[in-house]
């Protein structure tokens, strides 16, 4: 537990210690202290503030991931600057984040505490070796990424024999894809970055993306992705016309719906103050609307994330004849959402995150 506020350290410690399966073994008051204790104590999970004296949270994450890879949850303010800093921390190797003000996590303190404990338990299941592999990805200079040759014949990443077999079966269907739809949650920012930065400028489909993320974060995240990727990426707005080579990120705190026809599809952003739907944005809602407009001409992908959001929406797509893929357990930060569609028999293919770009390009070329 890393924070320079003694009040916040006590509060988080009390919340975590309510679960008999969790124990706060020590606290750190700054980034330097955090790095030293991470190396010495080898905790399963670290909670980390961003703004601290001597060494800030972002630099502390970088050093910890280099010297003693550990699952790290960042606490962040829900501001534009807080969002940018949190995204930098995730890029440095942190796996998850939560608002520092508990009333911004949930409407009552007990629910907020329960969610924090759940997140810690989920991330504690990560092994340090897997964390080291996940943390090796770092964003490259945006100019380098933008200057890479745009081509649909990008070098193929190897896939297993069963994966190649399933892909060849789909090719004979002659499916004409009209949309790529992606849903994700915990671990999604880095996973999306790994996938989208490898897509060429002339990518032939529009892309919709649903990432569980607070309202204050999605605009900063979309802007960050846009600087790193060759395709155009923006936070979705009502009235946006879906265009090839453009990716639309659902805004936090709202729902993203597709209207119109597959050749004239537009986005509609809905305010959602109800308690009926837990996730805002919801993968199920966006995927369900994609099924109505695009039918089976969708390639749907469920990436790393906690829970089962996306399972019902993927089933609706699948029933229309769409193709559904999921991220494999090994490369997931949390194997929840991908597991849900896999166990339900909805997903046709499980891939490591690094394998998605080439597999997507092959699939949409051949149908």
Positions of the model-derived regions?
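Conserved acid/base catalytic micro-environments in cytosolic active-site loops
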Residues: 1, 6-21, 27, 32-33, ...
């Amino acid at each position: 537990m890393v924070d320079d506020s003694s009040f916040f350290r006590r509060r988080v410690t009390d919340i975590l210690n309510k679960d008999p399966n969790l124990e706060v073994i020590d606290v750190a008051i700054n980034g330097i202290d955090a790095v030293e204790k991470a190396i010495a104590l080898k905790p399963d999970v670290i909670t980390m503030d961003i703004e601290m004296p001597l060494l800030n949270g972002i630099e502390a994450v970088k050093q910890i991931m280099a010297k003693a890879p550990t699952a790290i949850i960042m606490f962040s303010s829900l501001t534009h600057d807080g969002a940018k800093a949190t995204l930098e921390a995730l890029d440095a190797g942190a796996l998850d984040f939560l608002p520092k003000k508990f009333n911004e996590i949930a409407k009552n303190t007990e629910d907020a505490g329960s969610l924090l404990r759940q997140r810690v338990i989920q991330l504690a299941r990560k092994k340090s070796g897997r964390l080291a592999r996940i943390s090796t990805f770092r964003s490259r200079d945006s100019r380098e990424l933008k200057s890479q040759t745009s081509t649909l014949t990008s070098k193929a990443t190897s896939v297993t024999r069963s994966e190649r077999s399933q892909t060849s079966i789909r090719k004979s269907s002659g499916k004409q894809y009209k949309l790529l739809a992606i849903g994700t949650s915990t671990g999604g920012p880095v996973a999306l970055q790994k996938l989208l930065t490898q897509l060429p400028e002339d990518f032939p489909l529009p892309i919709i993306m649903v990432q569980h993320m607070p309202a204050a974060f999605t605009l900063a995240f979309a802007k960050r992705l846009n600087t790193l990727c060759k395709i155009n990426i923006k936070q979705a707005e009502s009235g946006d016309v879906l265009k090839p080579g453009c990716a639309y990120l659902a805004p936090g705190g709202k729902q993203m719906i597709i209207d119109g026809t597959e050749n004239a599809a537009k986005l509609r952003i809905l305010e959602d103050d109800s308690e009926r739907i837990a996730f805002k944005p919801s993968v199920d809602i966006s995927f369900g609307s994609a099924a109505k407009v695009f039918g089976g001409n969708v390639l749907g992908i469920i990436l790393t994330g906690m829970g089962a959001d996306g399972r019902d929406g993927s089933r609706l797509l699948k029933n229309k004849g769409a193709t559904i893929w999921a991220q494999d357990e090994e490369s997931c930060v949390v194997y929840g959402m991908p597991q849900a569609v896999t166990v339900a028999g909805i997903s046709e293919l499980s891939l490591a995150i690094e394998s998605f770009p080439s597999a997507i390009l092959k699939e949409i070329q051949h149908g």
